[in-house]
Amino acid sequence: MPSIFINIILAFIIALLGMLIFRSHLMSSLLCLESMMLSMFILSTLTILSLHLTMSFMMPILLLVFAACEAAVGLALLVTVSNTYGLDYIQNLNLLQC
């Protein structure tokens, strides 16, 4: 396995660990999700190009589309929560709070 694949997988694992560590803040969680999607995009693109899989050239583009939708929804949620509560804590998203 080339070192570029190991570096991309390591970047994904670091972003996943960041997601687990900074799970209380919405902005940090969104940044970790974006870095996870970026590493998945790069890994899928490199895999498709190195294996010459001509039938799945559209998969990285679909992954980018889903990442853009996720970013738009996440930023809208961040703006709504910060305007309502003044904080970006994820615990403010719980509708069952007393």
Swiss-Prot record:
EC number: 7.1.1.2
Predominant place of localization: mitochondrion
Transmembrane segments: 2-22, 37-57, 61-81
Keywords: Electron transport, Membrane, Mitochondrion, Mitochondrion inner membrane, NAD, Respiratory chain, Translocase, Transmembrane, Transmembrane helix, Transport, Ubiquinone
First-level EC class: translocase
Swiss-Prot/TrEMBL catalytic activity: a ubiquinone + NADH + 5 H(+)(in) = a ubiquinol + NAD(+) + 4 H(+)(out)
Example GO BP: ATP synthesis coupled electron transport
A Pfam family matched in the record: Oxidored_q2
GO cellular component, one term: respiratory chain complex I
Membrane topology: Multi-pass membrane protein
GO MF annotation list: NADH dehydrogenase (ubiquinone) activity
Compartments where located: Mitochondrion inner membrane
Similarity remark: Belongs to the complex I subunit 4L family.
Function: Core subunit of the mitochondrial membrane respiratory chain NADH dehydrogenase (Complex I) which catalyzes electron transfer from NADH through the respiratory chain, using ubiquinone as an electron acceptor. Part of the enzyme membrane arm which is embedded in the lipid bilayer and involved in proton translocation.
Subunit structure: Core subunit of respiratory chain NADH dehydrogenase (Complex I) which is composed of 45 different subunits.
The name this protein goes by in its record: NADH-ubiquinone oxidoreductase chain 4L
Organism encoding this protein: Varecia variegata variegata
Gene name tied to this protein: MT-ND4L
